[in-house]
Amino acid sequence: MILKHLDKEPVIDISSFVAPNAVVCGDVTIGKNVRVMFGAQIIAESSPVIIGDNCIILENAVIRGTDRFPLKIGNNCLVGPNAHLAGCTVEDEVFIATGASVFHGAILKRGSEVRINGVVHLKTVLPENFSVPINWIAVGHPVKILSPDKHDEIWKVQKPLNFPLTVYGIDRPESGESNNMADICKIMSDRLKPHMDNEIME
């Protein structure tokens, strides 16, 4: 399904394939010989999404340009099934495996890899030809690679990046307090409301 969003419609090269039940929404540009497979979602919220040539976007991947964070994928990249990319930059010849997540402001330099269920956290930069192992977490710049059980070490790098402020525009609550989910959901509801006026192009 191809959708116009905020008066912008996708531009898809004629040589590319978008599966019938994939969604391409809004200010999205897709280059030559790209394959967007079944169930994949490519959504430009309030920032554009640009996908280069010869890219493979596999089943149920989610690729999203978000508020203040456009998303760009270079040439010859593969995004695996159920992967999630939000507001990041992916340079040429990058491999993102099944179930991997890449968050806002992250940069994956040329030839890097994020293996199965790997995570590249907020504002993290992967150097060229760098690899994130299966289930491990990349965080910071310069990057550190940590296993999921290293919560305190991950938090030490992640906390100053202030995920709630960066992503939702809400400062992190005082120590020991939980995030204000009512405010976060209200912000997200307002951001997503314009989808009510989407127009189906094909």
Residue positions per predicted region:
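Glycine-rich hexapeptide-repeat left-handed beta-helix
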Residues: 1-9, 45, 59-60, 70-73, ...
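Extended, small-residue-rich solenoid/repeat segments and analogous flexible loops
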Residues: 1-41
